[in-house]
């Protein structure tokens, strides 16, 4: 890699690649999230992490009919939709990525890139969640998640990010 102290950014038709020393990340426009994390040749993700709003019911939930009162969050959890993507590279918003601009831009390097996805729930009334991934030259990813609640929504069972990733096994050797 020509600039080992910079991120190499690759704009694709459906993805944005961010590459550095020992890591490769792919952000999907179509899937609406971080699609691939490869560190030292090992793939960590099975699919894009997404906001989650639902949890397993307890007996108390069933007794109080919580699942009836807050059931719209189960639908929001299953059918969340990505409505927008924003890419900021070294503090400047980028308009270069597809599908708005499908021309090849040549080699692009950056010190930091922030990819923000705006998700919209199918609740009534609807609300939004912003998920931002900030990548620096060391390969660290900072994830910021912001839920924008609105009046009139039922009680929220849980809020977080759900991720499918490969298991990690650590073997410790003690003499």
Cite the ranges covered by each PLM segment.
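Beta-strand/loop-rich accessory regions of lumenal/periplasmic or secreted enzymes
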Residues: 1-175
